[in-house]
Amino acid sequence: MNNLKWVAYFLKSRMNWIFWILFLNLLMLGISLIDYDFPIDSLFYIVSLNLSLTMIFLILTYFKEVKLYKHFDKDKEIEEIKHKDFAETPFQRHTVDYLYRQISAHKEKVVEQQLQLNMHEQTITEFVHDIKTPVTAMKLLIDQEKNQERKQALLYEWSRINSMLDTQLYITRLESQRKDMYFDYVSLKRMVIDEIQLTRHISQVKGIGFDVDFKVDDYVYTDIKWCRMIIRQILSNALKYSENFNIEIGTELNDQHVSLYIKDYGRGISKKDMPRIFERGFTSTANRNETTSSGMGLYLVNSVKDQLGIHLQVTSTVGKGTTVRLIFPLQNEIVERMSEVTNLSF
């Protein structure tokens, strides 16, 4: 079937030749019908010989010229095509040389842009790490504040700054996340408690508590740093859009897969917003005057979840709250997926 495709392409590209040769032969036959002195038997012999030689010529040309395009169809690198001299005609060699120059130039641009991105990533990372030092010092100064009301307000703002810095750091590292992952069995409960501790100043100000219920074995095979980032972003959203209601957190077992749910009783997400919640920079169409949200939290979650093999489910009702469920993969599923990614990279 594939050969028939190439034959069809070849005949279509040579259709002008074929029509011209047929026209010349028909013209000779037409002349023989008008000129009775012209030997008809000799003419038929000439036409038959001409068509036969044309057929042989087309077959030989087909095998010679289609060879290059079959290599293109196999997605071979242009360097291999050029250095192995798969191009046989002058026009083919000119085409391959042009493609080689263009692709080489684009590759150089990609390498240059990648170096610039790496430098940008390094600059942002160093900036965040550097600014963490005065932020940590600020926390020590806040802890010395005697006025509890003022101290709580300062800790609330400090927690927001610290959270935004961490978010920026994760955004910067998104491109290199695959190189930055190490999978192991870790405790979901431990990760959740650690993240709750980081948000306690915000939850206290907003009058929000946490109902934690881990019913099943909570150990999952994942990368602890990126998994904590996902939990942090979901908790941050739950706190941001809730007030004076507890947030429920727990684990369940479904088809041997451990799932973690985080349920809040906040404003909820409208049906028209639901398809867009993972878009970069999207906040909400319901509260356009709100400036505290960056729209990066769920974008980060969505960008990382596939690398961790996590299946994400979000259900929400306006005015009643939102439930986010993280379904974790088994170890063999992660190993199999990583093997597929490795094979594709080669």
Swiss-Prot record:
<dbReference type="GO" id="GO:0005886">
    <property type="term" value="C:plasma membrane"/>
</dbReference>
<dbReference type="GO" id="GO:0046677">
    <property type="term" value="P:response to antibiotic"/>
</dbReference>
<comment type="subunit">
    <text>Interacts with GraX.</text>
</comment>
<dbReference type="GO" id="GO:0004721">
    <property type="term" value="F:phosphoprotein phosphatase activity"/>
</dbReference>
<dbReference type="InterPro" id="IPR036097">
    <property type="entry name" value="HisK_dim/P_sf"/>
</dbReference>
<keyword id="KW-0808">Transferase</keyword>
<keyword id="KW-1003">Cell membrane</keyword>
<keyword id="KW-0843">Virulence</keyword>
<keyword id="KW-0046">Antibiotic resistance</keyword>
<protein>
    <recommendedName>
        <fullName>Sensor protein kinase GraS</fullName>
        <ecNumber>2.7.13.3</ecNumber>
    </recommendedName>
</protein>
<dbReference type="GO" id="GO:0005524">
    <property type="term" value="F:ATP binding"/>
</dbReference>
<dbReference type="InterPro" id="IPR036890">
    <property type="entry name" value="HATPase_C_sf"/>
</dbReference>
<dbReference type="InterPro" id="IPR050351">
    <property type="entry name" value="2-comp_sensor_kinase"/>
</dbReference>
<dbReference type="Pfam" id="PF02518">
    <property type="entry name" value="HATPase_c"/>
</dbReference>
<comment type="function">
    <text>Member of the two-component regulatory system GraR/GraS involved in resistance against cationic antimicrobial peptides (CAMPs). Functions as a sensor protein kinase which phosphorylates GraR through the auxiliary protein GraX. In turn, GraR up-regulates many genes such as adhesins, exoproteins, transporters, toxins, and proteins involved in cell wall synthesis. Down-regulates the expression of many genes involved in RNA and amino acid synthesis or glycolysis.</text>
</comment>
<dbReference type="InterPro" id="IPR005467">
    <property type="entry name" value="His_kinase_dom"/>
</dbReference>
<keyword id="KW-0902">Two-component regulatory system</keyword>
<keyword id="KW-0067">ATP-binding</keyword>
<keyword id="KW-0472">Membrane</keyword>
<feature type="transmembrane region" description="Helical">
    <location>
        <begin position="43"/>
        <end position="63"/>
    </location>
</feature>
<keyword id="KW-0547">Nucleotide-binding</keyword>
<keyword id="KW-1133">Transmembrane helix</keyword>
<keyword id="KW-0812">Transmembrane</keyword>
<dbReference type="GO" id="GO:0000155">
    <property type="term" value="F:phosphorelay sensor kinase activity"/>
</dbReference>
<keyword id="KW-0418">Kinase</keyword>
<feature type="domain" description="Histidine kinase">
    <location>
        <begin position="126"/>
        <end position="332"/>
    </location>
</feature>
<feature type="transmembrane region" description="Helical">
    <location>
        <begin position="15"/>
        <end position="35"/>
    </location>
</feature>
<dbReference type="GO" id="GO:0016036">
    <property type="term" value="P:cellular response to phosphate starvation"/>
</dbReference>
<dbReference type="InterPro" id="IPR004358">
    <property type="entry name" value="Sig_transdc_His_kin-like_C"/>
</dbReference>
